Structure formats: structure tokens, C-alpha cells
């Protein structure tokens, strides 16, 4: 019996010796690295494989962000088989059948007159897409712009990297139904979106502030016929390489 205990102890010691602990320079793989936010996104009205969208968000975050491939108001905001980006949307959507509320979007573009969701749309490829809960990156081929997004508890940080040539801009679309967008100064946009799918008070508003690290050279405040889609097109001078925006949001 004593020999058995000794043999068992020796076996345990050998097993422990074979285990390697991460060195000081090594990083442990975070659980979030195992998450693919693209699972379930190959869905549409006729067939669901999950009816999800690639949420860029922290656990229990106030707001989620997602790439928008569908048209404004489409419950399937992101479909894996789509090849065009229309914007990067703040969303609170629980499912495509219930749809969204309090949403607005930002879209970096090149050139002027890009407010309409069709004219500002850009081709993108999943080959250039990185989709993690804490970080999203893609490349807008038609505009030659790289987009990066990372979330906070209540907001998000975005970085748009533009080409060296041609005038660049950022479209802020607060969607329809009485939403408003205005300018505080040459770095700050404030507004609110009233867009919803029902079930909210009559005076519902989702207020937002967008603060940029670089002043814009001009602003075009847009209000389509009938007050359909208020928003703004911020223009940056030629040679502006990178713009970072920070957003803050409050619901009333």
C-alpha cells in the first residue's frame, strides 16, 4: 500500500511538471476571442439561420453598434450575403420582427452629395472584415476608407482612415419621423432620433452627441422633402488622413 501511495505521488508530480504556465510576456486568450458575432447573420425574411447581427457591444451595454447592409427600416439590418455597406448603426433591436428603435447611423464617404443611403453605399468584402464583440473593422472599397469601431458602456469610438486625396466626409443620418441634427462647433454634432417601431411614448427621443478629434471644414444639414431624413454631411479638407469620433447617448 505504501508503495502505491509513493507511485501515485510520483505520477502527480510528473503531471504537474509537464504543465506549462504562461510566461510574463505571454497573454492568456480571452473568452471573447472565441466569439464569432457573424454566426446567424445569413438570414432574411424567408429563412432564418439565427436572425442576428454582428453586435459591437459590451455586456449589458446601453447601445449596440452594427454594420448596416439593409435599407433604412429593414429589420434585417445586416445580412452576411450582402456586399454593400449603407452605414454603421447604433441599434437596440431585439429581433427583425420587432425591429429597431432609437437608431441612427454614421457613414464615412468621399466626395459631396452622399447623404442618400443609395449614393453613399459602398462595396465591402468579408476578407477585410474583423468582427469581434469588442472590435469591428472593415474596408469600404468604393470610398477607399478603413473603418474601426470599439464599444463602451454607453457609447462607442470610431476611427475612419481616409485616402490622401479627394475631399472626405462623414454622413450622420438620424433617420425619419421628426429626428433632428445640428452643429455645436466645428468638432461637435448634437441631435436626436425619434425613429421607432412602436411601443414607446409619444415624445420618445434618443439624444446623441458625436465629438470628433479633427475639425470639419464644412457642414451640410440635410432635410429631404417632407422632413423625411434629417442629418448632416461633414466635409474634411483634402489630405485629412484619419478622423476619430466619440459618441454619447441619452434616452428621454
Q: What are the roles of these predicted feature ranges?
A:
Residues 1-4:
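Positively charged n-region of N-terminal signal peptides that target proteins for export
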Amino acid at each position: 500500500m505504501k508503495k502505491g501511495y509513493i507511485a501515485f505521488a510520483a505520477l502527480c508530480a510528473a503531471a504537474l511538471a509537464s504543465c506549462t504556465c504562461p510566461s510574463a510576456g505571454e497573454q492568456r486568450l480571452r473568452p471573447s476571442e472565441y466569439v464569432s458575432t457573424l454566426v446567424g447573420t445569413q438570414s432574411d425574411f424567408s429563412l432564418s439561420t439565427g436572425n442576428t447581427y454582428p453586435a459591437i457591444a459590451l455586456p449589458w451595454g446601453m447601445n449596440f453598434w452594427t454594420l448596416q447592409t439593409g435599407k433604412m427600416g429593414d429589420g434585417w439590418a445586416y445580412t452576411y450575403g450582402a456586399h454593400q455597406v449603407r452605414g454603421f448603426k447604433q441599434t437596440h433591436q431585439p429581433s427583425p420582427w420587432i425591429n429597431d428603435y432609437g437608431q441612427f447611423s454614421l457613414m464615412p464617404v468621399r466626395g459631396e452629395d452622399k447623404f442618400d443611403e443609395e449614393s453613399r453605399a459602398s462595396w465591402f468584402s468579408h476578407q477585410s472584415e474583423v468582427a469581434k464583440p469588442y472590435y469591428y473593422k472593415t474596408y469600404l472599397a468604393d470610398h477607399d476608407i478603413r473603418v474601426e469601431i470599439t464599444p463602451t458602456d454607453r457609447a462607442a469610438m470610431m476611427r475612419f482612415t481616409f485616402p490622401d486625396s479627394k475631399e472626405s466626409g462623414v454622413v450622420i443620418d438620424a433617420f425619419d419621423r421628426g429626428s433632428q441634427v445640428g452643429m455645436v462647433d466645428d468638432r461637435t454634432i448634437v441631435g436626436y432620433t425619434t425613429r421607432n417601431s412602436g411601443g414607446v411614448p409619444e415624445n420618445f427621443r434618443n439624444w446623441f452627441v458625436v465629438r470628433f478629434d479633427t475639425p470639419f471644414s464644412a457642414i451640410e444639414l440635410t432635410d429631404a422633402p417632407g422632413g423625411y431624413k434629417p442629418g448632416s454631411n461633414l466635409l474634411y479638407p483634402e489630405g485629412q488622413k484619419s478622423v476619430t469620433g466619440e459618441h454619447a447617448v441619452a434616452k428621454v
